[in-house]
């Protein structure tokens, strides 16, 4: 099993545990009720479509290839520095096992900065898309090889 398969399998286990706490239907309802100004007027899409280069800067504590990157992970400080430097969007790692990410990183960063945030995780279930919205994400990373569908589909709008 390659690393991507391992990440996906661990993600499936995490989702199964999360669903024991909050069902898919409940998570959908929470996501629908969650207000996120950064989703209004397609803020994420707009920053990517603007003239010139768009910058998506990443907050990452560790990785499988590098190990621990930032022992003293001052993620809020890093996010503010990215925004002040002109980032258009911030990508936040939430995968806990290999990247040492936390959902709280995304939640707190999204509350702190005025630019859109992406949840960077190994999305294997629609549950994670709704969950991402409740955490403040304006977008999620999708790796099609991890999703068991014949072609990409778009979930119902939840903004």
Regions found by a protein language model. Name each.
Residues 71-90, 112, 129-138:
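Alpha/beta enzyme core
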Residues 10, 93, 143, 156:
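Conserved residues at the C-terminal ends of beta-strands
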């Amino acid at each position: 099993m390659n690393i991507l398969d391992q990440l996906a399998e661990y993600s499936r286990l995490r989702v199964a545990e999360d669903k024991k706490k909050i069902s898919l239907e409940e998570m959908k309802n929470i996501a629908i009720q969650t207000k996120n100004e950064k989703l209004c007027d397609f803020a994420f899409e707009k920053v990517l479509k603007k003239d010139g280069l768009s910058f998506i800067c990443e907050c990452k504590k560790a990785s499988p290839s590098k190990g621990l990157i930032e022992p003293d992970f001052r993620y809020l400080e890093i996010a503010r520095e990215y925004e002040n430097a002109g980032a258009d969007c911030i990508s936040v790692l939430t995968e806990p096992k290999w990247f040492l990410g936390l959902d709280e990183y995304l939640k707190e960063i999204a509350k702190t900065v005025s630019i859109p945030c992406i949840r960077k995780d190994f999305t294997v279930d629609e549950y994670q898309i709704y969950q991402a919205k409740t955490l403040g994400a304006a977008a999620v990373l999708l790796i099609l090889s991890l999703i068991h569908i014949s072609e990409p589909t778009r979930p119902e709008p939840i903004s």
